[in-house]
From Swiss-Prot:
This is Probable dual-specificity RNA methyltransferase RlmN. S-adenosyl-L-methionine binds at G172, E173, S204, S227, L228, H229, N305. One of its GO terms (biological process) is rRNA base methylation. It comes from Streptococcus agalactiae serotype III (strain NEM316). One of its GO terms (molecular function) is rRNA binding. Belongs to the radical SAM superfamily. RlmN family. The gene is rlmN.
Amino acid sequence: MSKKTDTPDYKPSIYSLTRDELIAWAIEHGEKKFRASQIWDWLYKKRVQSFDEMTNISKDFIALLNENFVVNPLKQRIVQESADGTVKYLFELPDGMLIETVLMRQYYGLSVCVTTQVGCNIGCTFCASGLIKKQRDLNNGEITAQIMLVQKYFDERGQGERVSHIVVMGIGEPFDNYTNVLKFLRTVNDDNGLAIGARHITVSTSGLAHKIREFANEGVQVNLAVSLHAPNNELRSSIMRINRSFPLEKLFAAIEYYIETTNRRVTFEYIMLNGVNDTPENAQELADLTKKIRKLSYVNLIPYNPVSEHDQYSRSPKERVEAFYDVLKKNGVNCVVRQEHGTDIDAACGQLRSNTMKRDRQKAKVGR
């Protein structure tokens, strides 16, 4: 039976250590600082998946590493490849729980969407991620491991492709797992490791205003996206429970603080739900809402991926999206209709995991 705990009882991944933590651990166990640098190089540049592959590390120290850590804690369960090059992965954690990761081919390179929690408690009424409530947070090693396994998938193909961008937009609310997400960001951004540029990394939040303020003061130069999805409190509270705790006034005060502190642009994610939030009046409300920060904000209009459990929602027709877009553009709003990826596979975030868990339960019943 899967353990439902934020402190799982299994050997940690070495990916959970920052470079400084790995150096401290090596010194504590009788090695020199350079030994940690060698291990770091094996992990993130040579991208080995076992300590035994580290040929310049002594057998005794490899035994110590094996005693205390694993390299990658994830097991690949399912891989779905789309005709457009999108790849969706279902990974199994050491405690048997399942998470999703998505690789998207963009014109600028390979972008990976990572998951930060097992399940989600935010409660957006249109989203597949919240079909299963939060079981636990992922530790930063389990988040990093997603990137490493996706990169391994492409390394084995011998095409020389490299993960160049990361979006922290998978299952879960990243700012509800703040400490682990922050360590993950610093690990993948480390110049001595994967060296993924901060401006190639985007973190998305449903709107935890106090965490947006905290994030503004961290000094990390990654991009921030806010899942907005509605232009007024009444509508947003009806489809996003988080708005009852952090209404738009509080959220936008935090966003303004973030922009003033970092001088960085904020992206607003807006899923187009037919007959719900997609009228020209809604578009005008959105334009008015973002007017004060227009120069440093951007709106992503997102086609909805239908979820069978949320059949009260459907995708806005193309003409409604175009009319909405036109109102925004007339008001000087920087906006784009997001390109779709993986429409021929379990495309909605959380859908592959949900469908697999259903099949697993059905098999278990048959086997009784």
